[in-house]
Curated annotation (Swiss-Prot):
One of its GO terms (cellular component) is cytosol. Signal peptide: none annotated. Keywords: Cytoplasm, Methyltransferase, RNA-binding, rRNA processing, S-adenosyl-L-methionine, Transferase. It catalyses: adenosine(1518)/adenosine(1519) in 16S rRNA + 4 S-adenosyl-L-methionine = N(6)-dimethyladenosine(1518)/N(6)-dimethyladenosine(1519) in 16S rRNA + 4 S-adenosyl-L-homocysteine + 4 H(+). GO terms for molecular function: 16S rRNA (adenine(1518)-N(6)/adenine(1519)-N(6))-dimethyltransferase activity; RNA binding. Belongs to the class I-like SAM-binding methyltransferase superfamily. rRNA adenine N(6)-methyltransferase family. RsmA subfamily. This is Ribosomal RNA small subunit methyltransferase A. It is an enzyme of class 2 (transferase). Pfam families: RrnaAD. It comes from the Bacteria. Its main location: cytoplasm. The gene is rsmA. Specifically dimethylates two adjacent adenosines (A1518 and A1519) in the loop of a conserved hairpin near the 3'-end of 16S rRNA in the 30S particle. May play a critical role in biogenesis of 30S subunits. S-adenosyl-L-methionine binds at N19, L21, G46, E71, D94, N117.
């Protein structure tokens, strides 16, 4: 595979994190995993040159229910419009600022499927942005840097377990599905990639916790991950009775389960509400 940044007459732009998927075997596997069906509401983040876009459109899009796509590169937008016409509804702009709720069906039921080969340079911020729309999402299938996927699905007690693990596992059921080598892209990235499936928990399955407070606790815990929690969470000792929770502060952040972090955030909420 060539290391050239040019593919199909387009130069991949580093500032957009562009690495175009070109391996048709991998593309077929991804589409089979997504299993798109006619009439579904689906949005692709970063369609690029349309490697995934084309088979997705073939399986689900009609002029009445097009595939939606969010793309920042205006050169690519022009090419995609010319190629797919009314079957692709393009939204020009940054996915980090896009209101994905605007594409969901009216009502409370989840209706939106989200897919994409996400730019690796913004993957974590984008995943956190998408969390705010999880209540209208059926599922998400993303190509990401393998290291990020490993952190997303990591178990407590492992080095990969992180703030990202806790916050995403609180909101989604996640599975790593397919490993994708660098040579599947043009230009090849310097890292391995993987496909992850993310299915939001239904409202009745979610713990009753303020995600902002959960994020506050988890961020503090992982702020110095090699230190014990009695140091990183020490400022909360005056407001949270850790002993009553059965929460051992003589551990590191990576050794605490998602459920335990939720319990601490709930205790913090109860204390602050009582003040």
């Amino acid at each position: 595979m060539s290391n050239s940044r040019q593919h199909q007459g387009h130069f991949a732009r580093k500032r957009f994190g562009q690495n175009f998927l070109v391996d048709h075997g991998v593309i077929d596997s991804i589409v089979a995993t997504i299993a798109p069906a006619r009439g579904q509401r689906m949005v692709e983040i970063g369609p690029g040159l349309g490697a995934l876009t084309e088979p997705l459109i073939a399986r689900l899009a009609t002029p009445e229910t097009p595939l939606h796509a969010v793309e920042l590169d205006r050169d690519l937008i022009a090419r995609l419009k010319q190629r797919f016409g009314a079957l692709l509804e393009l939204h020009a702009g940054d996915a980090l600022a896009f209101d994905f709720r605007s594409l969901a069906a009216p009502g409370d039921a989840p209706s939106l499927r989200i897919v994409g080969n996400l730019p690796y340079n913004i993957s974590s911020p984008l995943l956190f942005h998408l969390m705010t729309f999880a209540d209208v999402v059926v599922d998400q299938h993303f190509m990401l840097q393998n290291e990020v996927v490993e952190r997303m699905v990591a178990e407590p007690g492992t080095k990969a377990f992180s703030r990202l693990s806790v916050m995403l596992q609180y909101r989604y059921v996640m599975d790593k599905l397919i490993d994708v080598p660098p040579e599947s892209f043009q230009p090849p990235p310097k890292v391995d990639s993987a496909i992850v499936r993310m299915i939001p928990y239904a409202p009745h399955e979610l713990p009753d916790v303020d995600p902002v407070l959960l994020g506050e606790i988890v961020t503090a815990a992982f702020s110095q991950r090699r230190k014990m929690l009695r140091n990183t969470l020490g400022d909360y000792r005056e407001t949270i009775d850790f002993d009553a929770l059965g929460f051992d502060l003589a551990r590191r952040a990576e050794d605490v389960s998602v459920a335990e972090y939720v319990g601490v955030a709930q205790a913090l909420a109860a204390t602050r509400n009582a003040q």
